Amino acid sequence: MWEPQGSLDPVLESIENELRDQVAEARSRWAGFDARLAIVQVGGREDSNVYIRMKLRAAENIGITAEHIQLPRDITETELLANITSLNESPYVHGIIVQMPLDSVHPIDSHAITDAVSPDKDVDGLNTINEGRVRVGDLSGFIPCTPAGCVELIKRTGVTIAGKNVVVLGRSRIVGTPVSELLKWEHATVTVCHSKTKNLSEITKTADILVVAIGRGEMVRGSWIKPGAVVIDCGINPISDPTKKSGQRLVGDVAYEEAVQVASHVTPVPGGVGPMTVAMLMRNTVQAARRQLDRLLAPTWPLRPLRITPLSPPPSDIVIARSQKPKDISELAHEIGLFSNEVSQYGRTKAKISLSVLDRMRNQQGAKYIVVAGITPTPLGEGKSTTLLGLVQALSAHRGRNSFAVMRQPSQGPTFGVKGGAAGGGYSQVIPMEEFNLHLTGDIHAGTAANNLLAAQMDARIFHELTQKDGPLFDRLVPKIKGVRKFSPIQLRRLKRLGITKTDPDTLTEGEKSKFARLNIDTSKIMWNRVVDLNDRYLRKITVGQSPTEKGFTRETAFDISVASEIMAILALGRDVEDIKERLANMVVALDKSGNPVTADDLGMTGALLVLLRDAFEPTLMQSLEGTPVLVHTGPFANIRHGCSSILADKIAMKLAGENGYVATEAGFGSDIGMEKFFDIKCRASGDTPHCAVIVSTVRALKMHGGGPPVSAGMPLNDVYVQENLELLSKGLCNLGKHISNGNKFGVPVVVAINKHGNDTPAELNLVKEFAVKNGAFRAVLCDHWAKGGLGALELADAVIEACDSKSKFDFLYPLQLSIQEKIQIIAKEMYGAGQVEYTDEVLEKIKTFTDMGYDKFPICMAKTSNSLTGDPAVKGAPTGFTLKINGIFASVGAGFVVPMVGEISKMPGLPTRPSIYDIDLNTKTGEIEGLF
């Protein structure tokens, strides 16, 4: 309370204590809470410095981190605006104030500068948006500090504002106009006067409350004031005073000594409205920080789903996708809690998300983690991607839960081959589907370039070593620059690995120079192929080096498809950029003639790889058909690699969704391949614990496993698949039972999602559902999201929510300290049902070599057909006791796993007789892609 004629110190102290308590309360909710104020000053006026020091002291007393950003006098308006934009975009700055006047040698529009400050960070309250809000009575924004301080002081007197006659003397944009509006919204009767007002003193004498901001020293005399009035003096004017050392003193617009004889309350100058203005600045800053915290900790996003109107029967996927207008990706990013500097837009429907999100939200608890896998599929697929999207559409758009789908980026090989796109289907898909299935943001192309540059450097190094003697080779590797030789950092790392401690190139012995310069790659033991993101069977075996310029140094090699590259697996498994860098450096591309590994770092490639892959570190934000968020990142093959989207994308999604949210991601193929690798490789690398596994099943696939005729892409289905056949279905249920059992072995609840197809009968669907529940499924539900979108997956969403709330007892299938053969044995028996494992002599020899090199402590990434639980794609159902034959093995040292090969696994698919390219065209009038799906 501000007592009559009393000091304002108790008022200021009370406000300071309130703000200090608010900061403490916020820190109790969020350990990393730090209210931050940026004070921008142009030039160095001493009067401005005085005000800034006041603000810095006030901030420190409250617990606000205030930064004084002093810019030079020669700064231009464009440069100043760039600084403000940077502060606007920073999630670590909550409030921005630009100290006026701007002391610049260049003309700068101060109004443009104040309007450049984001309304959400305009703690000075001078942005036109915030001023306009005050004008119309919307006080949800930031109120200008001096007017807010005036109203606060009046309230602290205990005087009721409503119904009082208020006179405001002054109409400035900063004080007079906004304070008059504020008092009007406090239900006072407000009269605004100014220097042209006639009979001014008579009007002021009618005021119960008088606010003066005219800018003329001691203009208002005691005779102008109504007895008992509250007087708020906003002026500060220097006048001559020979008794002062400076020769002047500061006075307000009111003759204070006269006013205190008449009024009940009068603010002193200095020490009145000035400190109160600073207090309101601090209040606005704390409010801004708390608003950001409230948004961060809100249980649900302010997500606005997109409405869909499903047609029956559903039209083609591309027709459905184009019937929906996506929301602008910047709008979706804002809804899910991203800041503009964390979002790099690629057009209006996709954007890269900065890894800095993980640092900003490091104290945020993660969301529930769900993996979607399947039974052993038919060549047509059973709808895992569609189920994944239907699930998150149901969770977000219909159950109001924060949820992400995290997906792999599809390769263009299958897109132009036979499979088509991988964006889901029907009313559960990613949009725009053409962008999702084609180049997207170029990550696969970046991986292709990095992979092939490494291959080019390796072959070039082999050539140069074959055509040069030790001395010239060393001199070219470590050239003199301005007469001085110097090792690069990556060369120093090689020296360290070689046990050479010298750092001056000129001090190396001839033997050390030779050891450093020669990699001595054994061309018969090269493990690194070039890649291309297309299906091209004629690249499965090629000869390189046939040009006369290569002097006869030819060798046989091959191209793989880009998503089979180890680099793609590393991007998917890296926990941060430093981890990715280390993994890239450790990639083994060949063995030397002594049998030692030759790495990418030995070839000097690590830094160049990082540069090529820089943008590919970040996941891409897209949206589902119902406007819910989807993160797309990396696309490692599910057979030769681990077949999962990236750890980084999952971690960003889990932070953004929050502890009450859900993140669902897909594992390639069935539980025997994709889900096992998700748990034993991806979760082991990430440290994240899954809460639930969803196994996708169809009646069609189970009939195939019961002995139905083969299912082939592009061929009509046999009648048994479109007519009720409970006997055939019953025989195939064993495959579903095996996949449920596989999930349960990891200690996570398994929800079975039964995708409905048009020809499925109620009896068939119920048979599958009853079997699943009796054989270990946590829940089994029917799903119709392909036809209905999220509404068709509500039962699935509810089952997943319930499963995630139950207690998961997740554990890995095997410990890493077991031998390579022991780990393979466990996977073969537990996941596939094998009785024993056989190895070729060559495989056994390689296992011994890998063990000697320390690779035996890596997890196992089995390369096996996805069409059977066995190694034979023709064997269906769930056989047991069979022999699994390992006929090849290699180590992906950078990715960090050993890959046993079961049967022939191609790393380069081929095009079929009639690939989908026959149907694809571009409408030259509309620019739309036709026939892609």
UniProtKB/Swiss-Prot annotation:
The keyword Cell inner membrane does not apply. This trifunctional enzyme consists of two major domains: an N-terminal part containing the methylene-THF dehydrogenase and cyclohydrolase activities and a larger C-terminal part containing formyl-THF synthetase activity. In the N-terminal section; belongs to the tetrahydrofolate dehydrogenase/cyclohydrolase family. Gene3D superfamilies: 1.10.8.770, Formyltetrahydrofolate synthetase, domain 3, Leucine Dehydrogenase, chain A, domain 1, NAD(P)-binding Rossmann-like Domain, P-loop containing nucleotide triphosphate hydrolases. Substrate binds at Y51, I52, R53, M54, K55, V98, Q99, M100, P270, G271, G272, V273, G274. NADP(+) binds at G170, R171, S172, S195. Residues 304-933 are annotated as: Formyltetrahydrofolate synthetase. Pathway: One-carbon metabolism; tetrahydrofolate interconversion. GO terms for molecular function: ATP binding; formate-tetrahydrofolate ligase activity; methenyltetrahydrofolate cyclohydrolase activity; methylenetetrahydrofolate dehydrogenase (NADP+) activity. This is C-1-tetrahydrofolate synthase, cytoplasmic. Its EC number is 1.5.1.5, 3.5.4.9, 6.3.4.3. Homodimer. ATP binds at T378, P379, L380, G381, E382, G383, K384, S385. GO terms for biological process: L-histidine biosynthetic process; methionine biosynthetic process; purine nucleotide biosynthetic process; tetrahydrofolate interconversion. The keyword Ligase applies. PROSITE patterns: FTHFS_1, FTHFS_2, THF_DHG_CYH_1, THF_DHG_CYH_2. Its main location: cytoplasm. Keywords: Amino-acid biosynthesis, ATP-binding, Cytoplasm, Histidine biosynthesis, Hydrolase, Ligase, Methionine biosynthesis, Multifunctional enzyme, NADP, Nucleotide-binding, One-carbon metabolism, Oxidoreductase, Purine biosynthesis. Residues 1-303 are annotated as: Methylenetetrahydrofolate dehydrogenase and cyclohydrolase. It catalyses: (6R)-5,10-methylene-5,6,7,8-tetrahydrofolate + NADP(+) = (6R)-5,10-methenyltetrahydrofolate + NADPH; (6R)-5,10-methenyltetrahydrofolate + H2O = (6R)-10-formyltetrahydrofolate + H(+); (6S)-5,6,7,8-tetrahydrofolate + formate + ATP = (6R)-10-formyltetrahydrofolate + ADP + phosphate. Pfam families: FTHFS, THF_DHG_CYH, THF_DHG_CYH_C. InterPro entries: Aminoacid_DH-like_N_sf, Formate_THF_ligase, Formate_THF_ligase_CS, NAD(P)-bd_dom_sf, P-loop_NTPase, THF_DH/CycHdrlase, THF_DH/CycHdrlase_cat_dom, THF_DH/CycHdrlase_CS. The lineage of its organism: Eukaryota, Metazoa, Ecdysozoa, Arthropoda, Hexapoda. It is found in: Cytoplasm.
